[in-house]
C-alpha cells in the first residue's frame, strides 16, 4: 500500500481495508454515523426551504443570505452523497460499478471543497457588511447577488478541476495482482497516480486550503477588531454601567464568528487525525474518528444559522408548545 502525503488527493476515508475488514459490522458506529447524517440532512433541508420561501415572498435579502442558502444546499447534497458512500462502507454489498464509484466520490469531494469556499466567502461578506463607510471594503456593500453568483460559479468550476483526478484514480474493480491501492468503500478503490500527478494535485489542494483558511482567519480577526472598537465607543458614550444592545448586524457577525471558529477548530482536528492516520496506517480508531469529524460542521452549521432567524425560532417554539399540548 502506498503512503499519501498530508495534503493528499485521497477522496474520503481511504483505509487499508481487506476482504476480512469488519468496519461494516460494527452496528453502534454505523447507527451513530447514520444518525449524525440524518440530523444534518433534516436541518439543512429546513434551512434551505426557509431561504427559498424568503426569496419567493420577496423579502429584503442581506448580502449573506445567498451564501447561507447555498451553503445549506451544498451541505445537504454532501450529506446525501456521504450517506450513499457510508452505505457501501458499513454494508458489504459490493454492487457498484466504476461509473457509480467515480460519480459519488467525485461529487462528494467537489461539494466538500465548495463548502470550504462558501464558508470563506460568507466570512468575507460579513466582514464587508460590518465594515465602516470609511473602509476600503465599503464599496463592495452594494454589490448585487449577481456578482456573488458569478464568483460562486467560477470557484465551482475551479474546484471541479482540482478534483478531476478522482475520475481517473477511482475504480470499482482493482487490479488484485498488486497491493498498490487503497480501499475507499467496500466497492470502490483508489489507485495512486504517478508521483508527478500526485504531487501536483497535493500542491493544489494545499494552496487551496491554506489560502481560504488564511483569508477566513483574517476576515474573522477583522470582524473581532470592529466589534471591540464599536463596543468601546458605545461604552464611552453611554457609560460603563450600561450594557450596549447589539444590532442585528452585530448579532449576525457574532454568529458567523462562532461558526468560523468552529470550522477552523474542526479543520485543525481533522488535520491531526489525518496525520495520525498517515503515521499509523492500520489504526481503525483514527478511521472511525475521521468518519464522524468530517460531517460535524455540515450537521451543526444549520442549527447555528437557524438560531439567529427570529421567524424560525418562533416557529419552533410554537411547534414545541403544540406538541406539549397534544
From Swiss-Prot:
Topology with respect to the bilayer: Multi-pass membrane protein
Q: Which GO terms describe its molecular function?
A: pheromone receptor activity
- Please list the GO biological process terms of this entry: response to pheromone; sensory perception of chemical stimulus
| Regions of this protein lying in the Extracellular compartment | 1-32, 92-104, 171-209, 276-285
Positions on the Cytoplasmic side per record topology: 54-70, 128-149, 231-254, 307-326
The GO cellular component terms are: plasma membrane
Primary localisation category? membrane
Question: Where is this gene product found?
Answer: Cell membrane
Record-linked InterPro entries: GPCR_Rhodpsn_7TM, Vmron_rcpt_1
Q: Where are the transmembrane segments?
A: 33-53, 71-91, 105-127, 150-170, 210-230, 255-275, 286-306
Q: Which cysteines are joined by disulfide bonds?
A: 101-188
> Entry's Pfam families?
V1R
Report where it is expressed, by tissue.
Answer: Expressed in 1-4% of neurons of the vomeronasal organ. Only one pheromone receptor gene may be expressed in a particular neuron. Not expressed in the main olfactory epithelium.
Keywords for the protein's UniProt record, in alphabetical order: Cell membrane, Disulfide bond, G-protein coupled receptor, Glycoprotein, Membrane, Pheromone response, Receptor, Transducer, Transmembrane, Transmembrane helix
**Where are the glycosylation sites?**
175
Gene3D superfamilies cross-referenced by the UniProt entry: Rhodopsin 7-helix transmembrane proteins
What role does it play?
Answer: Putative pheromone receptor implicated in the regulation of social as well as reproductive behavior.
State the family it belongs to. Belongs to the G-protein coupled receptor 1 family.
> What is the official name of this protein in its record?
Vomeronasal type-1 receptor 100
Amino acid at each position: 500500500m502506498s503512503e499519501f502525503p498530508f495534503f493528499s488527493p485521497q477522496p474520503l476515508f481511504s483505509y487499508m481495508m481487506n476482504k476480512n475488514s469488519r468496519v461494516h459490522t460494527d452496528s453502534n458506529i454505523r447507527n451513530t454515523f447514520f444518525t449524525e447524517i440524518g440530523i444534518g440532512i433534516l436541518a439543512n433541508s429546513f434551512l434551505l426551504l426557509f431561504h427559498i420561501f424568503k426569496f419567493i415572498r420577496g423579502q429584503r435579502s442581506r448580502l449573506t443570505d445567498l451564501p447561507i442558502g447555498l451553503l445549506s444546499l451544498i451541505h445537504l447534497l454532501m450529506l446525501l452523497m456521504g450517506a450513499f458512500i457510508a452505505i457501501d462502507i458499513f454494508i458489504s454489498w459490493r454492487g457498484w460499478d466504476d461509473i457509480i464509484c467515480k460519480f459519488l466520490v467525485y461529487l462528494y469531494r467537489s461539494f466538500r471543497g465548495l463548502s470550504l469556499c462558501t464558508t470563506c466567502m460568507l466570512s468575507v461578506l460579513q466582514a464587508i457588511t460590518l465594515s465602516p463607510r470609511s473602509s476600503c471594503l465599503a464599496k463592495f456593500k452594494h454589490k448585487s447577488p449577481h456578482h456573488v453568483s458569478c464568483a460562486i460559479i467560477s470557484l465551482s468550476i475551479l474546484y471541479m478541476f482540482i478534483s478531476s483526478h478522482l475520475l481517473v484514480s477511482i475504480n470499482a474493480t482493482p487490479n488484485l495482482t498488486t497491493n498498490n491501492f487503497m480501499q475507499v468503500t467496500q466497492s470502490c478503490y483508489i489507485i495512486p497516480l504517478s508521483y508527478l500527478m500526485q504531487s501536483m494535485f497535493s500542491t493544489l489542494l494545499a494552496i487551496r486550503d491554506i489560502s481560504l483558511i488564511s483569508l477566513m482567519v483574517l476576515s474573522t480577526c477583522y470582524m473581532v477588531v470592529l466589534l471591540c472598537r464599536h463596543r468601546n465607543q458605545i461604552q464611552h458614550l453611554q457609560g460603563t454601567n450600561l450594557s450596549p444592545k447589539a444590532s442585528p448586524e452585530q448579532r449576525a457577525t457574532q454568529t458567523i464568528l462562532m461558526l468560523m471558529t468552529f470550522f477552523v477548530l474542526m479543520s485543525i482536528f481533522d488535520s491531526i487525525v489525518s496525520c495520525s492516520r498517515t503515521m499509523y496506517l492500520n489504526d481503525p480508531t483514527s478511521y472511525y474518528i475521521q468518519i464522524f469529524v468530517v460531517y460535524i460542521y455540515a450537521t451543526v452549521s444549520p442549527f447555528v444559522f437557524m438560531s439567529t432567524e427570529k421567524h424560525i425560532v418562533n416557529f419552533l417554539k410554537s411547534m414545541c408548545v403544540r406538541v406539549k399540548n397534544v
